[in-house]
Amino acid sequence: MIQISTTTGPTTEPITTAQAKEHLRVTFSDDDAYIDALITTARQVVEARSGMRLFTQTVVLRADYWSEIGFSDPHRLDLVSLRVAPVQSVTSVNYYDDDDIDRTLSTALYWTDLDSVPCRMQIKDEWPSINERAGNIRVTMVVGWDNTDNIPAILK
């Protein structure tokens, strides 16, 4: 089963309370907390439906097997789809080996393609052997745009 969870949420929203109030033509402050909650909810819905993370945050992609998140093209380029975009960086790739030891995959063993949507990882040789533990593979990533000005208007 594939799961993406947020471990560190964004520190800001794609639009400000003032921008939302201007759009709604609200001139009083009584409902500011409610408007802020609506902004957060709207961002979360956009992120869930689009797979795009709007502002910098840390997420963990969990999977049971490499094949769940991977695919192979005809040239045997074993790729893993990171399922979210934009990805600023892959912080770590952890897995439990055959002896049930938590290992970190060396960055020297894979490439990342962070410009594709969805972003991808490609193993240089072959994926390491893993055990059958649920949630065995954990890919930790920093995702989202680093500046609200870079977020496409259609997603705001």
Question: What is the predicted function of each stretch?
Answer:
Residues 1-156:
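Divalent metal-cofactor coordination and adjacent catalytic microenvironments
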